[in-house]
Amino acid sequence: MIISAASDYRAAAQRTLPPFLFHYIDGGAYAEYTLRRNVEDLSQVALRQRVLKNMSDLSLETTLFNETLSMPVALAPVGLCGMYARRGEVQAAAAADAKGIPFTLSTVSVCPIEEVAPTIQRPMWFQLYVLRDRGFMRNALERAKAAGCSTLVFTVDMPTPGARYRDAHSGMSGPNAAMRRYWQAVMHPKWAWDVGLNGRPHDLGNISAYLGKPTGLEDYIGWLANNFDPSISWKDLEWIREFWDGPMVIKGILDPEDARDAVRFGADGIVVSNHGGRQLDGVLSSARALPAIADAVKGDIAILADSGIRNGLDVVRMIALGADTVLLGRAYLYALATAGKAGVANLLDLIEKEMKVAMTLTGAKSISEISGDSLVQELGRSLPAALAPMSKGDAA
């Protein structure tokens, strides 16, 4: 098949993956309005076309936390990444490393920290949740530091798991889930051979290393459900600072006041994010939340953004709305599931080309020249105020 965009990878991934895995990453919370709004709102951000600007010396390079990035993109933490391709975290990290951008390893990765870190040249980032088991958190931080991880991404929008109705229908959860997953795997031989048989062990590597025993999918669901901590507060972040002296990014900010709190706390960065629409349906899309947050804290803290980004044009839009860098989640996972490391590498090349086109036609020679001035104001920052119901279609 012809691959020219992330949407092509999504279609290919749907054919390759058992339904329980495809819908786990593709779906969102409740009726998935926020999931779809993430994409729809971002698509409504209109850019000013500028011409005759001599764009021959255009550059996408940027700096974040004293790291040089070839473009303002990093791969987001994604749980169970190693179930989408054989040792998926290793393959995705290699593609990001070759492109000169950061890879973020999830707490609930299949491949443990110690397997991924030695395979790449640049330091990877590590993502952590606040969990009841503080011993695990401390252990994970110590291991991340020992492995040379440079930046901690601290996810704060999961004090409790979101209600994801698709999971019950697809076999990730619900009645007879294990049997349904087995038969789905049988019906998807490419995945069954590449990942099901040759991608073992299917442990949650970071958790298994701490518990001293294998942890499979059922353990993943049960352990996390029992360990998410609804008592999370800024005091927990103070505790984390005792064990982590590198850059610390707070992921899951949607309100300007929370962004100001992150500045007061002394965080190095925030991620404007609604967890890809997977936590609470009906909240603002990241594109709609970002401008007010940028107005509140731009210049005081690094602003990253995710949710709804599917191409290089979307990256430029997010930066114009106020982000310094973006995180890619679903987009790279579709590519990984389709073609492994090569798929992710190709996706990143596509995004780079799309960014160059968008910057050339908006007159921005560098990332620093992308700003609110790049927007058509009536159609840029002023996005629709209401979360009106949308037709249920392609949520990619």
Curated annotation (Swiss-Prot):
Ranges where the FMN hydroxy acid dehydrogenase domain occurs: 1-380
Active site: 275
Keywords in alphabetical order: Cell inner membrane, Cell membrane, Flavoprotein, FMN, Membrane, Oxidoreductase
Membrane-related topology note: Peripheral membrane protein
Record-listed substrate binding positions: 24, 129, 164, 278
Cofactor: FMN
Main location: membrane
Pfam families xrefs: FMN_dh (PF01070)
Alphabetical list of Gene3D superfamilies matching this protein: Aldolase class I (3.20.20.70)
EC code(s) of this entry: 1.1.-.-
Gene Ontology cellular component annotations, sorted alphabetically: plasma membrane
Keyword hit for Transferase: no
Binding site for FMN: 106, 127, 155, 251, 306-330
Family recorded in the similarity comment: Belongs to the FMN-dependent alpha-hydroxy acid dehydrogenase family.
Protein name listed in UniProt: L-lactate dehydrogenase
